[in-house]
Amino acid sequence: MSKMKSVMGGVLLLALSSSPAFAGKADAGKWINNEFQPSTLSKSEQRAEMDWFIKASAPFKGMEINVLSETIPTHEYESKVLTKAFEEITGIKVNHQLLGEGEVVQAVQTQMQTGRNLYDAYINDSDLIGTHSRLQLAVNLTDWMNGEGSDVTLPTLDIDDFMGKSFTTGPDGKLYQLPDQQFANLYWFRYDWFQRADLKSKFKKIYGYELGVPVNWSAYEDIAEFFSVHVKNIDGVRIYGHMDYGKRAPDLGWRMTDAWLSMAGGGSKGLPNGVPVDEWGIRMEAGTCNPVGASVSRGGAANAPAAVYAIRKWDEWLRKYAPPGAASYDFYQSLPALSQGNVAQQIFWYTAFTSSMVAPKESGNNTVDNDGKPLWRMAPSPHGPYWEDGMKLGYQDAGSWTLFKSTPVDRRKAAWLFAQFTVSKTVSLKKTHVGLTPIRDSDIRHASFTERAPKLGGLVEFYRSPDRVRWSPTGINVPDYPKLAQIWWQQIGDVNSGAFTPQQAMDRLATEMDLVMSRMQAADEKAKVYGGCGPRLNEKKSRSYWLNQPGSPKAKVNEKPQGETIGYDELVKRWSSN
C-alpha cells in the first residue's frame, strides 16, 4: 500500500510538473528569487501577483507579439531580460524592438495614419497625450481597464502609485497611456570643483557672489564664463564651463520642445503645464481643448521675446563656452563627451543617463572617484529672466505604454499583459535600480534607494522632493505632436548655421506652426478628425496688443539680472525638510 502511494505520488508530481500552470509557477519562483529583488512586495505577494499573470495569460499562451520603444538602458533591460521572464512565466513570446526616438514616433504616426497594426503596443512619450486624446486612435485605458480589458487588468496595478499619471491624462480626465519610465532634465555640475576653496574665492572676487548651484540663467552664464575664460585649466586639463549640442538634426527639435522656452520663462503659470500658454508657445484657453495659435499675433508665445532670448542664449553659450566642435554635435555625440571630465556644468541634462555617468573609472568615466562615487551632482534647472513662481521649471520624459484600436483585441490584451508585467510591483523596483528611471513613488522611497542614494548624484533626493512636480512633459496644448515637432529642428537648425537670426527663426517657426494648425482646423471642422478639439485659430492682432496683456506672451524684460546661486548641500536640506 505504501509502495502504491509512493508510485501514485510520483505520477501525480510528474503530471503537475509537466502542466503549464505548474511550470509557470516554478519559473515565476525562480525569477522572483534570482532576479526580481529587491521589491516593495514580500515574496509571497510577488508569487500571488505572478499567479494572476499565469491565469490571465492562459488564453494567449503560445502567441507571439511585437512591441516597440526607444533605446535607453531601461528598455534594453525590458527587451533582453523581461521578455524572457514573461515568456517563461506566461508562455507568451514578446519581440521588444529598440529604435531611436524619432523612428518610434514615425512608427506611431504610420500606424495612426494607415490603421495597419505594425506593433501590438508602443512605449511612446507622453508628449503625444494631446495627440492621442484628440485623434481617439489610441485606447482610452480608463475605459479599457473597466470594460473590454478588465479580465486582463492587474488588480494590484495601483495607478495612484505612478508619479506620472497626470502626464498621461487627457483633457477628458481619462488615462491614455501607462508610464513605463520617467526621467527629468536637470542641471548637472562638478560638485568637487564647486567645493574648492580657491575656485570659490576667485569666483566671488570676480562676480561678487558665491559659486554654487545657479538659480537663474545669469548665474549659469557667469559660471560658464568663469570656468571657460578665467579658470581654463584644472589639474593640467583644459576645461569648459558649458556643454550642449547644435547639429541640424531631429534631436535638436526636442532639445527645444523639451521645455527650453519654459525654462527661460516663456509660458504661463500652471502645473503640470502652463495655462493658457504652454512650453511650445501654443495658446489654449483654460477649460477648452482648442489651441488658438503659436504666434504672438494670435496670443501665442513661440516668437515672443522670451522664446527669442532662449534660442539666442542656446546659440551664444554653445559658441562661447562649450568645447570645440560641440556646435556640430548631435545629442548622441554630446553624451559621451561629458564623461571625459572636462566640463564644469550642463544646463540641459537628462537623468536617464545617470547609469552611464556612474560607470566605473576604469571604463573611461572621468567623473567618478576611485571608489566609484560621483564627483558631480544633479540639481534643479536654473530659470531665465521671464520665469515666474508657479511655472514649470523643466522637462520630464514619461515613456508610456500606448495601445491602439487598430490592434486586434486578442493581441492587444496579450500586449497589455506584458506592459503591466514590466511595471508591476514585482518587477518595477529592480527595473528602476537597473535603468534609474523611476515611475512608482513606492519604489523611489524604498530603503534600497536610501542606501544607494550617495552613489547616484542627487537622483533619489530629487525624486523624493516636492520640487519634482515642476518638471513635466509636453502637455495637451500640442494637438498633433508628430506634425508639429519636425518644424522645430528645421527652423532652429538655421540659427546654428547662421542663415537666420533667433528672431527670424522663431518668426518662421511660429508662422509655420500656425499654418499646420490651420490645416488641422479645416480637417477637424470638416470631419471631426481631432474629435472637435482641433485648433481654432484666433484672428491676428498686433504684437503690442498681446504683449500688453497680462501673462504670456510677455514683453521684453531686463535679460541680465543679478546672478543668484544656492549651496547644493543647503538645497538638499531644504528638500529633506519638506
Regions found by a protein language model. Give the residues of each.
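Hinge/lid segment of periplasmic solute-binding proteins
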Residues: 25-59, 126-186, 281, 375-381, ...
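Short, polar/charged alpha-helical segment
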Residues: 49-56, 73-91, 188, 192-194, ...
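Long, aromatic- and glycine/proline-rich binding clefts that accommodate carbohydrate-like moieties
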Residues: 50-52, 64, 373-383, 395, ...
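Extracytoplasmic "Venus flytrap"/periplasmic binding protein-like
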Residues: 84-162, 196-198, 202-204, 344-345, ...
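Short helix-initiation/N-cap motifs at beta->coil->alpha
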Residues: 99-107, 215-219, 326-339
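Periplasmic solute-binding protein
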Residues: 126-137, 142-146, 162-209, 221, ...
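Extracytoplasmic/periplasmic substrate-recognition and gating elements
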Residues: 169, 319-324, 333, 342-345, ...
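Glycine-centered hinge/linker elements that transmit conformational signals in sensory
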Residues: 219-225, 262-328, 372, 381
